[in-house]
């Protein structure tokens, strides 16, 4: 038994000693073993055609299972010991990798079985017509995103690559020996692989395989080192780094490019005059094509210093030297050492003209590209000059520049600015929220014109409930509209449309959020969508601050209008995914008493089908309820919190109670709180099931007095519950972790109310916490 189980067993024993046994006949109390075995949804997917849904159920310890469902909610197939699962591009297949059983592997490890003798994974290719192909001894696999093909390797000592269609009736299949790496293009059936070759037919090098035509092309022959192999989006172009000296300590990389499946040519060689003097192509810099594939971005860096391989390691000096006035603390330098050694600076190769331009350097190292790399200007920034002052200011200033992707020329936009600039999708504007004045700004990349979009009087952009000794955060943005014409900004409740040049008045698109105290937020269902289309219907999620319930709403942002309610109530809605080619969605619905089972519906939510039945796990166990309560703090503020009561609650009885909290949690009234043997907090269902009440009060802070703020908020809440007559005043405990751990430790110095207090990983020193 591990320490986690030991600790929870101790809690079970404590419960047995401290609380009376609840008189129950039909139901049982949860145990630690129940928590460990509790099945949760750890993954879900809907096919592109919306006809099939796969869901992964997984215990906290043990083997997961993937279940396949059709649109009527019928379970079609089950895949035990499941790991990864993916639908094919055509939606005709489900591919599932399976692990060997955990108990079997654990027993073999106990017997000291060698690693190469342990069982391997398997790959199941399941046709949605019912056929099943199983590939044993799986090492790794990749599924193409746009065609029904899979590539895989199997066997520990065999590095042969197998590439085949998912349709087992097709005889087409390709094999390549001694393959080191492989991958498919994002939007085509093109596959690259790197092989050491064999003595018969396959030369060593980088190959391109067109799975749709069967044509295989040797892109670059060589047994050297290949790095950063990258397709453009459509798979028409392929770029990579190559060094022929595979056994040298330092890999002198050059940049190669293959276009339209032709053999690759070297486009940026080592020592290219366009690179800064003494700089080289970095093997750690990410290769990236622009959206149009007219530009190829790569990383450069100063040539790294080489170790003296003629000197023994024990004869090398092993000292660490730093000075008191360094702008970055030595501990931070030491922590980031490996990251800094691999740091690279972006450059661009213009494919059509062959020109090379260095964009970033050591002085201006951070870069943001606009329009997926096709914008004429990029945004450069650095916080290097302000590293020292950031230690006591608590935030970092930055300098911002535009840089031309054509010639590398730079123009200063802002100096010593606290804002974190971002780029609009097409790269026409930089935009940011200024914490120091709680306003949103834009800046034209073309002419440097700065525009203030909001003022503290005209628009409440900030967190109105901020209660920490710092500037309030923004509520964020919903995104940009097409052609960078408008920026959609959230306030506490609504979504507003702003003209980035402030030539038009802002428009409240959702209109009634603040009036009804519903916080609307845009749900992005298409992961590839870069902008918000004002003419398309949009899905919003709404949170009701009064009831704590959730809903989905329909809106169309072409005109301002109150969103149309689709589904809303006293529950939590989340984990929504849409089929790519239809309006079908999957989502979860939950409350404290209702398991977050997976549901299937169309976007109007008129008919919803429950697919999974995780709630069945509860039927044999005592299950508590959640209730919203309110009271007045000692300093006169109205507060809310949640009381979790045991099953079959009897107000005439006295119950032991645990107070557990972390800042504000009343908005989680309808969270299921998945049963879990957690390392840092109590499990609410476990304690409810064993006869305890759990109280989670909201804590609102006054600057400089976090502990006393906790006392002022929590104590009258506890008194309010005691006043109801069902709390055993001699059996009240408090539990908190980290920031909550600090506060329960403070409570121990202010009151004798609590019979026991557990303070987990508490903040021991406010000075040290600020220093971090």
Give the location of each predicted region.
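Alpha-helical transmembrane segments
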Residues: 5-12, 44, 576, 704
């Amino acid at each position: 038994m591990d320490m986690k189980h030991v600790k929870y067993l101790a809690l079970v024993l404590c419960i047995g000693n401290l609380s009376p046994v609840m008189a129950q006949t039909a139901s049982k109390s949860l145990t630690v073993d129940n928590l460990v075995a509790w099945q949760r949804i750890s993954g879900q997917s809907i096919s592109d055609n919306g006809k099939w849904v796969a869901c992964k159920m997984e215990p906290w310890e043990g083997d997961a299972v993937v279940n396949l469902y059709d649109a009527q909610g019928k379970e079609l197939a089950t895949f035990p010991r499941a790991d990864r699962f993916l639908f094919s591009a055509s939606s005709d297949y489900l591919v599932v990798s399976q692990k060997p059983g955990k108990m079997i592997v654990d027993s073999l490890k106990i017997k000291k079985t060698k690693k190469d003798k342990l069982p391997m994974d398997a790959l199941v290719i399941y046709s949605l017509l019912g056929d099943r192909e199983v590939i044993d001894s799986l090492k790794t696999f990749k599924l193409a995103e746009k065609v029904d093909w899979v590539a895989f390797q199997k066997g520990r000592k065999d590095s042969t690559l197998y590439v085949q269609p998912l349709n087992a009736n097709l005889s087409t299949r390709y094999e390549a020996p001694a393959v080191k790496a492989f991958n498919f293009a994002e939007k085509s059936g093109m596959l690259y692989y790197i092989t050491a070759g064999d003595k018969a037919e396959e030369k060593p090098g980088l190959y391109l395989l067109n799975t749709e035509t069967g044509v295989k092309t040797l892109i670059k022959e060589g047994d050297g080192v290949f790095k950063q192999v990258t397709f453009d989006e459509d798979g028409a172009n392929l770029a990579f780094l190559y060094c022929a000296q595979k056994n040298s300590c330092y890999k002198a990389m050059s940049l190669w490019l293959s276009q339209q499946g032709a053999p690759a040519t070297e486009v940026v060689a080592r020592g290219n005059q366009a690179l800064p003097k003494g700089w080289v192509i970095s093997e750690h810099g990410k290769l990236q094509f622009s959206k149009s594939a007219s530009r190829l971005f790569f990383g450069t860096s100063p040539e790294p210093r080489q170790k003296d391989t003629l000197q023994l390691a024990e004869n090398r000096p092993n000292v660490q030297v730093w000075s008191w006035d360094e702008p970055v603390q030595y501990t931070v330098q030491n922590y980031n050492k490996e990251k800094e050694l691999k740091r690279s600076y972006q450059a661009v190769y213009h494919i059509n003209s062959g020109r090379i331009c260095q964009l970033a350097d050591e002085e201006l190292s951070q870069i943001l590209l606009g329009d997926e790399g096709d914008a004429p200007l990029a945004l450069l920034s650095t916080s290097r000059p302000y590293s020292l002052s950031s230690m006591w200011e608590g935030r970092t200033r930055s300098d911002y520049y535009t840089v031309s992707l054509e010639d590398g020329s730079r123009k200063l936009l802002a100096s010593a600015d606290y804002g974190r600039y971002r780029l609009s999708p097409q790269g026409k504007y930089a935009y940011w929220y200024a914490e120091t004045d709680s306003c949103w700004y834009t800046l034209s990349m073309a002419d440097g014109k700065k525009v203030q979009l909001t003022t503290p009087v005209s628009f409440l952009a900030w967190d109105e409930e901020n209660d920490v000794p710092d500037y309030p955060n923004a509520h964020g943005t919903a995104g940009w509209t097409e052609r960078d014409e408008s920026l959609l900004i959230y306030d506490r409740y609504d979504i507003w449309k702003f003209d980035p040049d402030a030539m038009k008045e802002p428009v409240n698109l959702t209109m009634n959020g603040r009036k009804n105290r519903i916080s609307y937020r845009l749900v992005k269902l298409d992961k590839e969508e870069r902008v918000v289309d004002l003419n398309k219907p949009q899905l919003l999620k709404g949170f009701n601050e009064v009831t704590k319930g959730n809903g989905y709403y329909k809106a169309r942002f072409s005109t301002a209008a109150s969103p149309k309610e689709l589904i809303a109530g006293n529950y939590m809605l989340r984990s929504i995914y849409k089929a790519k080619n239809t309006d079908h969605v999957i989502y979860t619905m939950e409350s404290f008493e209702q398991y977050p089972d997976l549901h299937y519906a169309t976007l109007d939510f008129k008919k919803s089908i429950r697919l999974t039945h995780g709630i069945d796990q509860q039927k044999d166990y005592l299950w508590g309820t959640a209730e919203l309560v309110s009271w007045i703090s000692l300093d006169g503020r109205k507060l809310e919190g949640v009381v979790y009561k045991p099953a079959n609650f009897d107000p005439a009885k006295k119950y032991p109670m645990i107070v557990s909290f972390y800042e504000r949690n009343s908005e989680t009234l309808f969270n299921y709180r998945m049963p879990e043997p957690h390392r840092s907090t109590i499990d609410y269902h476990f304690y409810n099931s064993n006869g305890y009440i759990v109280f989670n009060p909201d804590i609102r802070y006054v600057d400089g007095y976090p502990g006393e703020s906790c006392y002022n908020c929590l104590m009258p809440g506890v008194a309010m519950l005691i006043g109801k007559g069902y709390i055993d005043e001699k059996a009240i405990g408090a539990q908190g972790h980290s920031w909550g751990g600090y506060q329960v430790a403070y409570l121990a110095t202010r009151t004798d109310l609590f019979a026991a207090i557990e303070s987990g990983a508490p903040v021991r020193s406010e000075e040290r916490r600020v220093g971090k």
